[in-house]
Amino acid sequence: MSNLFRSLASSMRALSLAAPRATAVNTTKTVVSTHQTRCLSQGLLSRHICTPMCSHNRPVAVCQSAKNGLQSKQQSRGMKVHSAIKKRCEHCKVVRRKANKRQNGYLYIICPANPRHKQRQGYR
């Protein structure tokens, strides 16, 4: 078993690109010194606060189902602005909004089936 460990250690040293061997004591000293030179706010913000919804507390199947749920939700952005707006599908509706005494308002196309069909008529 010790021969296996020695060969593994020697192969890891060979892969380390001829860097000097670091001991555990040296690495802990450098970590401690970098944490001492930070501001208090940086230290607090960089720490990971474990909550019930952390990814390492949940099983993998739950994490993947949550990711799939986020991908299936469609994000709606702004509207397309055209001088001539058209209905693109049977679900599209023409709506006139922001009308007052001095202005006729804007014509909008809204579509509950496909949010990409949202349009607003440009200035004339």
Swiss-Prot record:
The keyword Ribosomal protein applies. It is found in: Mitochondrion. One of its GO terms (molecular function) is structural constituent of ribosome. The keyword Mitochondrion applies. Its main location: mitochondrion. InterPro entries: Ribosomal_bL36, Ribosomal_bL36_sp, Ribosomal_LSU_bL36. Keywords: Mitochondrion, Ribonucleoprotein, Ribosomal protein. It comes from the Eukaryota. One of its GO terms (cellular component) is ribonucleoprotein complex. One of its GO terms (biological process) is translation. Belongs to the bacterial ribosomal protein bL36 family. Component of the mitochondrial large ribosomal subunit (mt-LSU). Mature N.crassa 74S mitochondrial ribosomes consist of a small (37S) and a large (54S) subunit. The 37S small subunit contains a 16S ribosomal RNA (16S mt-rRNA) and 32 different proteins. The 54S large subunit contains a 23S rRNA (23S mt-rRNA) and 42 different proteins. bL36m has a zinc binding site. Component of the mitochondrial ribosome (mitoribosome), a dedicated translation machinery responsible for the synthesis of mitochondrial genome-encoded proteins, including at least some of the essential transmembrane subunits of the mitochondrial respiratory chain. The mitoribosomes are attached to the mitochondrial inner membrane and translation products are cotranslationally integrated into the membrane. This is Large ribosomal subunit protein bL36m. The gene is rtc6.
